[in-house]
Amino acid sequence: MTVNKKLAIFDLDHTILKCNSDHSWLDYLINKGFIRREEYLEQNAEFQKKFREGNVNYKEYYEFTIQYLKDNSDDYISDIRSDFMKEIIEPSINIYALRLIHKHYEKNEELLLASGTTSIIAGPIAKRLEFKNVVCTTCEKENNIYTGRIEDPPSLGEGKLK
């Protein structure tokens, strides 16, 4: 017996959320003192310049944005991320998007969250919103310790399909 279900695909940033979750996460880490503001802003400005010129290497950019993870366990990051979810993400959830998500659930449709956001943030948000299917940029781990690298390909454009 074949069951045909409709698939509803949602983006995360400025759709389900009223913010850019990766940028909000980095701002949060800077404001809490986990990342040095001056160092981050200087390096980020260089990436933004390359982006405007059309020369940005997204893998390098993502790995720059997750360097703070390197050599840390998910348990360590989990406590920090939990506070971030309460303080930043919960108030940023778009109530209209949430209603739409629930309408799809009520129709027994499959839902997919497809985002360029890193797994460190997209995963917990997907869990909070009860998405079973998630495509995001995956932060690499070895023995439950973050390496500071991402798995190829980044979840942008065609990378969301691979």
Where do the protein language model's features map onto the residues?
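Conserved active-site and cofactor/substrate-binding residues in soluble primary-metabolism enzymes
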Residues: 20, 72, 159
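Active-site phosphate-binding/coordination module
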Residues: 22-24, 28, 33, 74, ...
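Short, compositionally biased "basic patch" segments
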Residues: 49-53, 58-74, 133-140
